[in-house]
Amino acid sequence: MSQNLSQTFLAITRNDTDLEWLQGALAPLGQVVSAGGGSLDELLALVDVTFASLVFVGLDRDHLVAQSALIEGVLEAKPMLAIVALGDGMDNQLVLNAMRAGARDFVAYGSRSSEVAGLVRRLSKRLPAVTPNTQLG
């Protein structure tokens, strides 16, 4: 039998429609929780609470510098975390900026559910097991 793959993923998306698309695509693997508006401290706190090992960050041209800085900041604080950027797949600048900031991969909004789930499965196999920190002092 297959192992229990129920995980929690965090996502910063453009809107509720994009969040719902991501939740639908990843429903067989776990739950996708909105990480709010993109505050670094808020995102890091959610990672600690949910033990998420994968975070989706939506990118757009209007906020690209701040979104790239967010990816860099998260990875500086939590280097073992995997970041997957979301955005317009036809916009090469978004893809390049995501990779330069340290994202592991890029997914175009509206991609097929099987593609998104396959990507998450592959990334999850490469990530270290996340265990709760029992030393909270």
Tell where the protein language model's regions lie, with residue ranges.
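C-terminal output helix
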Residues: 111-119
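A short, hydrophobic beta-strand element within the central beta-sheet of small alpha/beta folds
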Residues: 80-90
